[in-house]
């Protein structure tokens, strides 16, 4: 029964809770609008080798992730679903990998289903599936490389080992073209100690060349093409995005070594209490090949990222698949032994968290409302909170038969939460929806201007026009603006009025401003007084009319 219905049930959950919500809310700034615009620009210009952000060189990431998002927009259109579908499909494929690897490790359909369901219902995994960035894609390629690595050691035939190494090389090549050299490093971190432990180092060195060759064959054509078009690409990408980020004294997002430990606990929601039990059982079974391999996969990348100076939460997403398998193994073993107290306590913990969330919402709505004149959003919040509470109540009351109930609460949370956001968040962080309301006037403008990269990329994506001039801002495009052919894409406070005076001779100017401080209010003051003004949250749209001859 479990074997027959496992994958269909997972597929139904994927469709209902991963795919359907993709188009229910606008694009977040700055990440989603950036990736949407860069990918759309590839479709518009045909420049597939060198990434450009609103026509400005942008060398912070390779191209494969943009290609996938561009394919989504090519197939489904320049819309919210088209932008996000690559993230959803990448996460769905990682769920399939969890199922297949669990089946290979234990040949127990219950453990296969439990492992895949736990991974799929990790709240952070499900949230990433509906968010347009490169992390879900990179996570899939790393997951595929390490699943393939297990098969390279586990296969007993030469043909099976060769095919596994080919798959590993494919994953490393695509992972490298998605986010860089980490796609090569992470499998090596696991492969070397595991091969030494298993006394298979000779086999690793003999057959490993197949994976290296495949990875090179996949990535080399693009590597040569981008070097030919942009000779400085590799210098910037290697030193800025790898050495400085992970080892430099001025590393981005510097955090202490223990930064990821509480995050790992948070990332295991709604199965938090299975985390210590899963790790304990894995340590007790560490001499078994399966547990030892999964522990290496979990611990070594986690240690590497903990020791690096620059840290972001998404870096440890590849650690969650082995964690889900270890926890799924423990869960099924406990169910088989009739030990359900831990699962009941897990349900109680989630239930208490849900009740506290509900009480906090009621309190703030009475004292300082989060939702003002938006009953539809408030209803959605109550629905998702009640769904969370009821699903975890079921696990607490019937842990033996309804052990999977928290997954439903997690799915409801990630499916409904984006559509239930208060207007105060939507108006300030999702400007593309406001831009849609005025797209006719903005689309007629001969020139476009914005003081914020997130708002500018939302404008460029919605209008399918990369030619947005940046007003007194540069941020992550500082490097690209240093090129002579794009230096004019930015105007500062002293240049903006002459620029407007010249630009409005040709036609109207569409301006999207993000006004959060007195500095930005001063930027607004320098705009012409005869402009039409539309305001929503901290996003302000101006339509500056064409000047009279």
From Swiss-Prot:
InterPro entries: ArnT_tfrase, Glyco_trans_39/83, LipidA_mod_glycosyltrf_83. Its EC number is 2.4.2.43. HAMAP family: ArnT_transfer. Catalyzes the transfer of the L-Ara4N moiety of the glycolipid undecaprenyl phosphate-alpha-L-Ara4N to lipid A. The modified arabinose is attached to lipid A and is required for resistance to polymyxin and cationic antimicrobial peptides. It is a multi-pass membrane protein. It comes from Pseudomonas fluorescens (strain ATCC BAA-477 / NRRL B-23932 / Pf-5). The keyword RNA-binding does not apply. Pathway: Lipopolysaccharide metabolism; 4-amino-4-deoxy-beta-L-arabinose-lipid A biosynthesis. Its main location: membrane. GO terms for cellular component: plasma membrane. This is Undecaprenyl phosphate-alpha-4-amino-4-deoxy-L-arabinose arabinosyl transferase 1. Keywords: Cell inner membrane, Cell membrane, Glycosyltransferase, Lipid A biosynthesis, Lipid biosynthesis, Lipid metabolism, Lipopolysaccharide biosynthesis, Membrane, Transferase, Transmembrane, Transmembrane helix. It catalyses: 4-amino-4-deoxy-alpha-L-arabinopyranosyl di-trans,octa-cis-undecaprenyl phosphate + lipid IVA = lipid IIA + di-trans,octa-cis-undecaprenyl phosphate. Disulfide bonds: none annotated. GO terms for biological process: lipid A biosynthetic process; lipopolysaccharide biosynthetic process; protein O-linked glycosylation; response to iron(III) ion. It holds the Pfam family PMT. GO terms for molecular function: 4-amino-4-deoxy-L-arabinose transferase activity; mannosyltransferase activity. It comes from the Bacteria.
